[in-house]
Amino acid sequence: MKKQPIGFMDSGVGGLTLVKEARKRLPNEDMVFIGDQARLPYGEKPAATVREFAWQMANFLRHQEIKALVIACNTATAAALPDLQAQLAIPVIGVIKPGSIAALQTTHNRRVGVIATTGTIQSAAYSQQMAALNPDVQVTGLAAPQFVTMIEANQRHGQAVQTIVNQILQPLQKSEIDTLVLGCTHFPLLTTAIQTAVGPDVTLVNPAVQAITMLEEVLTQQQQLATTTPGTLRMYTTGSVAAFEEIAQQWLAQPDLTAQQVDIQKEKNDGPDR
């Protein structure tokens, strides 16, 4: 039987934070990643536009014969998860429910902060998901779209970066949160600066960990977990290959990683599976 890959999609390089976790936990799985860098940031775009772009990425990955799809983007999860789950005949996993579950398992005072893109914060997806799981939780959301721009420019370290992060997260100082969800898959690449800004008493939650746990559970239930040969990784971007490869090689600690540029708008669209 042919070994089918897992598909990962994001607006840019942020989704590699899930790929990194998946490669650590599921080393025998083949993976395909698409980052739509040519059209980021998604967080400032209307939900309808994000849904259109998300379908184009999913359609591209569908032609790679994937067995499961991970929407490695909070903005796209908030806007397009129900649609993609209805349209595709494979498991589709987002990051907001996993992030919410992890936050509720972490918090002691039921005060949770969420930093994300403008689109994710305005959708109230995290506060609604957490309220559905625990009505007693108090969620404080803060849009931090500047972080995406910084990370895509590979500006992740140094005092200048720390100063900007401190300024952006300053509104959380009086919120009394004890848990902070990194509600954009780019944000774990700024973990050190974010932790410094909020202090040691606030626990950071990376939804990638719980999302890959859910992925592993789904593949196990469907008896599709790869267990034999080591997995491979193919990476595609709609933007600059050089910029993508620089961050991917650093974040995944593999200096030989390469990516290909693709135009997903030209990909043949056969319509939904169902």
UniProtKB/Swiss-Prot annotation:
- Residues where substrate binds: D10, S11, Y42, G43, N74, T75, T185, H186
User: What biological processes does GO assign it?
Assistant: cell wall organization; peptidoglycan biosynthetic process; regulation of cell shape
- Active site: which residues? C73 (proton donor/acceptor), C184 (proton donor/acceptor)
The reaction(s) catalysed by this protein are: L-glutamate = D-glutamate
Q: Which SUPFAM superfamilies match?
A: Aspartate/glutamate racemase
Q: So, what pathway does this thing act in? A: Cell wall biogenesis; peptidoglycan biosynthesis
User: Mind listing the UniProt keywords for this protein, alphabetically?
Assistant: Cell shape, Cell wall biogenesis/degradation, Isomerase, Peptidoglycan synthesis
EC number in record: 5.1.1.3
One GO MF term on file is: glutamate racemase activity
Classification via NCBIfam families: glut_race
Q: What family does this belong to? A: Belongs to the aspartate/glutamate racemases family.
Question: What is this protein's function per UniProt?
Answer: Provides the (R)-glutamate required for cell wall biosynthesis.
What is the name listed in the Swiss-Prot or TrEMBL entry for this protein?
Glutamate racemase
Species per Swiss-Prot/TrEMBL record: Latilactobacillus sakei subsp. sakei (strain 23K)
| Lineage of the species this protein comes from | Bacteria, Bacillati, Bacillota, Bacilli, Lactobacillales
